[in-house]
From Swiss-Prot:
Catalyzes the initial step of the lipid cycle reactions in the biosynthesis of the cell wall peptidoglycan: transfers peptidoglycan precursor phospho-MurNAc-pentapeptide from UDP-MurNAc-pentapeptide onto the lipid carrier undecaprenyl phosphate, yielding undecaprenyl-pyrophosphoryl-MurNAc-pentapeptide, known as lipid I. This is Phospho-N-acetylmuramoyl-pentapeptide-transferase. Pfam families: Glycos_transf_4, MraY_sig1. Pathway: Cell wall biogenesis; peptidoglycan biosynthesis. Its cofactor is Mg(2+). PANTHER family: PHOSPHO-N-ACETYLMURAMOYL-PENTAPEPTIDE-TRANSFERASE, PHOSPHO-N-ACETYLMURAMOYL-PENTAPEPTIDE-TRANSFERASE HOMOLOG. One of its GO terms (biological process) is cell division. GO terms for molecular function: metal ion binding; phospho-N-acetylmuramoyl-pentapeptide-transferase activity; UDP-N-acetylmuramoyl-L-alanyl-D-glutamyl-meso-2,6-diaminopimelyl-D-alanyl-D-alanine:undecaprenyl-phosphate transferase activity. The chain crosses the membrane at residues 5-25, 50-70, 78-98, 114-133, 145-165, 177-197, 200-220, 236-256, 262-282, 311-331. Keywords: Cell cycle, Cell division, Cell membrane, Cell shape, Cell wall biogenesis/degradation, Magnesium, Membrane, Metal-binding, Peptidoglycan synthesis, Transferase, Transmembrane, Transmembrane helix.
Length: 335
């Protein structure tokens, strides 16, 4: 199993590194350039026109690698997690296309995006229960306690799914930030899926569970390869195509490994980023005052004098620590 995991990461890395130099000029010629918010940090204005929608680059690497290295590429686990990633990626692609190609700055309207995200979340949770027997219970982090929610499971977990996918999207605001934080989150899921496959982890495990570890490893390789082109100064941005797809991959892994609540620990950086936006909007609308210099939180530190690379490194470290804590929370429930 470990051989397939390492090879999946290596193959996704190689494919991404090969595709990058081929795709970036194409995106540039097609004028798929990023528009920069004028109210954002002034140093970001120099990034205007940088090719976006680059998430396509690592998505190809992840999918091809995962399918080649999977024990059974057509297993329901693999089909569902890839579908979750590509489904949310498709919403992001449509959003990017409207903004960049059709020049409608806001892209998909909020309600349109939300309808698609909720529909995918309900399909994922229903499918995992109906076809893979994952159940409608939640495992409480750091324990082996299962909390049965019944039908309430679907709206509750769908709320988590939509929240996390959008939070990953919010985190994609600095060069290398979303790719790096997701890399560490995916490393956590390599560990969790491997533990689930080898020991059961206290949940109902079906055949080919190790393929989820292979998929997560491919995502690690894809994110690592993309950093070659996305680190500061970025030659390409992943766009909503990439960030929503990565969020979809994470929630797919969470639902299929029964770590829906542990995902909130592993994705702690995303959660904090999303909360910073919610608090900022609430404070401004109720008091007329802002809590942060700018939200999401990474911009607050930027406007406080931190250079972009320092912010990214601190957030990467936070993501690593959250990932380790998430794995510990999972392992604690095994004993």
């Amino acid at each position: 199993m470990w051989e397939r995991i390492f090879l999946a990461a290596a193959l996704a890395l190689m494919i991404t590194l090969i595709l990058g130099p081929l795709m970036i000029p194409v995106l540039r010629v097609m004028k798929f350039g990023q528009t920069i918010r004028e109210e954002g940090p002034k140093r970001h204005l120099a990034k205007a026109g940088t090719p976006t929608m680059g998430g396509i680059i690592f998505l190809v690497g992840i999918v091809v690698s995962a399918l080649i290295m999977a024990e059974k590429p057509t297993s329901l686990e693999m089909v569902m997690v890839i579908s979750a990633m590509l489904g949310y990626g498709l919403i992001g692609f449509i959003d990017d296309f409207i903004k960049v190609v059709l020049h409608r700055s806001l892209g998909l309207r909020a309600y349109q995006k939300l309808i698609g995200q909720i529909a995918l979340a309900l399909l994922l949770t229903w499918g995992a229960n109906r076809y893979l027997g994952r159940g409608t219970d939640l495992v409480i982090p750091f324990t082996s306690i299962h909390l049965e929610l019944g039908l309430f499971y679907y709206p509750f977990v769908s709320f988590i799914i939509v929240g996390i996918t959008n939070a990953v999207n919010l985190t994609d605001g600095l060069d290398g930030l979303a790719a790096g934080t997701t890399l560490f989150s995916m490393l956590s899921y390599v560990s969790i899926a491997t533990l689930a496959a080898s020991q059961g982890g206290g949940v109902a495990i079906l055949a080919y569970e190790s393929d989820l570890a292979v998929f997560a490893a491919a995502a690690v390789g894809g994110c690592f390869g993309f950093l070659r082109f996305n680190k500061n100064p970025a030659r390409v941005f992943m766009g909503d195509t990439g960030s929503l797809a990565l969020g979809g991959a994470l929630v797919g892994l969470a639902v299929l490994t029964k770590t829906e609540l542990i995902l909130l620990i592993i994705g702690g950086v995303y959660v904090v980023e999303a909360i910073s936006v919610i608090l900022q909007v609430f404070s401004y609308q109720t008091t007329g005052k802002r809590i942060f210099r700018m939200s999401p939180l990474h911009h607050h530190f930027e406007l406080g004098g931190w250079n972009e690379w320092k912010v990214v490194m601190v957030f990467w470290l936070a993501s690593l620590l959250c990932g380790v804590l998430g794995v510990i929370a999972y392992m604690a429930g095994m004993f």
